[in-house]
Design a protein with these regions (language model features):
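Short amphipathic alpha-helices in soluble, non-transmembrane regions
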Residues: 20-26, 82-90
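Glycine-rich beta-strand-turn "strand-cap" elements at beta-sheet edges
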Residues: 31, 35-62, 87-117
Length: 117
């Protein structure tokens, strides 16, 4: 069954270019590891929900926007194996990949794909 990783987090609007470069680099890394597709998105519209919202979920601050990233895998097993290998990469271990966002406010999870139209 297809599997999707979903990441949501805040990024300073002024860091759009830095985030785009980071997203491209991570996209290449995950595709090389076996992902079927990677989609990175720059936020533009975050309406308030009745009980929660994207903005409150990531504790959005003034001057920030929200980014999302969707990584599609053939299966959860493929994703788990790929992430285990990616975490062994020198760049991932050395911290040489600066992350242009506040990692403490990122939310993420894995989802079984139920359908696509």
């Amino acid at each position: 069954m297809a599997y999707m990783d979903v990441f949501v987090g805040p990024v300073l609007i002024a860091d759009k270019d830095a985030y785009a470069a980071y997203a491209r680099m991570m996209g290449e890394l995950t595709l090389q590891a076996g992902a079927l597709s990677v989609t990175a998105c720059w936020g533009s519209d975050f309406p308030d929900g009745m009980a929660n919202s994207f903005a409150s979920a990531v504790k959005l601050q003034p001057g920030e926007t929200i980014v999302t990233r969707f990584v599609r895998w053939t299966s959860k097993d493929m994703r788990d194996a790929a992430w285990a290998e990616m975490m062994k990469a020198r760049d991932m271990q050395s911290g040489s990949m600066p992350m242009p966002f506040d990692r403490t406010r990122v939310i993420f999870g894995g989802f079984e794909v139920l359908g696509e139209e």
